Structures are given as C-alpha cells and as structure tokens.
Regions:
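Short, well-ordered alpha-helix to beta-strand connector turns
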Residues: 31, 70-71, 121-122
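N-terminal beta1-alpha1 ligand-phosphate binding loop
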Residues: 1-27
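Structured adenosyl-cofactor binding patch, chiefly the S-adenosyl-L-methionine
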Residues: 115-159
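General small-molecule cofactor/ligand-binding pocket signal
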Residues: 6, 34-36
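Residue-level preference for the first positions of well-ordered beta-strands
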Residues: 2, 72, 102-106
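A mid-sequence interfacial segment
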Residues: 86-128
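S-adenosyl-L-methionine/SAH cofactor-binding core of RNA-modifying enzymes
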Residues: 39-101
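Short glycine-rich anion-binding loops that position phosphate/pyrophosphate groups of nucleotides
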Residues: 11, 78-81, 109-111
C-alpha cells in the first residue's frame, strides 16, 4: 500500500520539518509514503467570508486537479468523525485489506477545504476537535499513521 498526503502550504518551521522527516523515515518499512505540498493562495489580512471562500476554492482546485478518478481520498475535517489510535489503525488496515493500493489524505490550508474537494473525498475524518496549525496537522497525521502500523503489527512503540 502507498500513502500520499496532499497538503496546502509549505512547512517553514525547522522543528516541524525534523518531526515530519523522522516519521516519514519510521513509516518507510511499513509503506511507501509521500507528501506533496501545494502553495497557499494569497490572502490579505482580515479577509471577508467571500474572500475566504475564494481562497478555499483556489487551493481546492490545486488539490482536485492532482487527483485521479480512482484515487481513494480521505479528507481531514475538524467536523467529521474522530477515531482513537486503535480505530485509526483498523481504519487504515481495512483499506489495505480491501485492496486499496493508494490512499490519499488531503489537508487544506488555514481556512479548510473547498466544498468541491469535500464532495470528492471518499471519506472524511477528524484527528481531533482541537484546532491545530495546518502545518502541524501533517506531523500529527504521520505520527498516527506510524502508530497505526505499530498497533496493527502488535509491535512496541518507543515514543
């Protein structure tokens, strides 16, 4: 199985880059994994609701145009179902057992995902009801993917 993460925004903070690289390395024995970054759409300070929708639409088109028709897409959405780590592990492994050769997670920008992209997703999950920097979401998702493989393989996870 291959896992792909499509994300809006470039990681600027070194501590996040280091953490992301660490978990990419840890995941490699279990699965091929890649992160593809797309640039943030420009937005002025204190945008109006219509400007926010425009930003989400522009960012959404970048991700949407990258997807293929047969991609299995999971969007990360604050308002969708939350899974604990064991449930997340089962969720990912169920996709693998069903023969999914590629799972694509999508992470929106600061204002979230466009409606078009939400409709395109095959499923949507929430990592938490808490709000995180969207750049931090990548690290949290990678850690949970790694933890999920460790749970599935019944291996000790050295934190």
């Amino acid at each position: 199985m291959k896992i792909r993460i499509l994300a809006i925004g470039k990681i600027k903070e070194n501590y996040l880059k280091e953490g992301i690289q660490e978990y990419l390395t840890r995941i490699k024995p279990y699965s091929q994994i890649e992160i593809i970054e797309f640039p943030d759409a420009p937005v002025k300070d204190n945008p109006s609701l219509s400007e926010i929708e425009k930003v989400k639409e522009l960012e959404g088109k970048k991700l949407f145009n990258f997807l293929k028709n047969d991609d299995y897409v999971i969007s990360l959405d604050l308002n969708k179902k939350e899974l604990d780590s064991v449930e997340f592990s089962k969720y990912i492994m169920d996709k693998m057992v069903l023969g999914r050769s590629l799972i694509t997670f999508i992470i929106g920008g600061s204002y979230g995902l466009s409606d078009e992209l939400k409709k395109r997703a095959n499923d949507s999950i929430s990592l938490s009801k808490m709000t995180f920097l969207h750049q931090m979401t990548r690290l949290i998702l990678l850690e949970q993917i790694y933890r999920g493989f460790k749970i599935y393989k019944n291996e000790t996870y050295h934190k």
